[in-house]
Amino acid sequence: DGTWWGASDWSKDGKKILIQNYISITNAKAYILDIQSKKKEIILGSDNTESYNAVLAFDQSDKGIFYITNEFAEFNQLAYKNLITNKIKVLTDTIPWDVDGFVISMDGEKAAFTVNENGFSTLYLLDTMSKKYRKVDRVPIGLIGGMEFSEDGGRLGLTINNFQSPSDSYVLDLKTNPLLFGDLTRWTYSEVGGLNVSEFVEPRLITYKSFDDRPIPAFIYAKECLEPQPVIISIRGGPE
């Protein structure tokens, strides 16, 4: 049909699959596919109004789902839908940034998600039962990806890309309480061609006004120097 279809998660009993239907960057739906009957039921999105809905995972009881949506705000928010009552709870309604990553532990008791704050990733831990979350405050500034829980849920693996590292692996020690964590340990040191990373320039986040007085965020990579230097402005993305 010209759109993209893919599987997001299996139910714990192995009888159902969460199916993602991506139509465009502003329109995505989700379904539950019953393996035995081969029938699918729409659970997120509508034919009448467009909204982005990225289905992520079943909860530990298979009675609800976690997903990312822009239906209720100008940001992509993390939300939870109870499949029995059809009630929806936006979990990150106090975070004015896009949620762009999510992972859940094998037992479904813990989850982690990332938020894009002006170009940098912020990591949060989520208690899937209480729906409370906590910011992890000991992660180096950069872009976070590749998140995965260990089988026992005691560790969270992730990659961090920043101004001194193209992408390196880190492991965050976790406690029994889903919101408690221990040390963050770096596991790899990527090849940078023999360059001295201490001389790499750390970007500085600034904002400047556009022609219509909108604040535009930008990163400046500039070494200390006495004379004015030429500047290259690289613009990523645009209206969609």
Language-model segment annotations:
Residues 230-234:
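Hydrophobic beta-strand anchors of alpha/beta hydrolase catalytic cores
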Residues 1-227, 238-240:
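Peripheral, non-catalytic segments that deliver or gate enzyme domains
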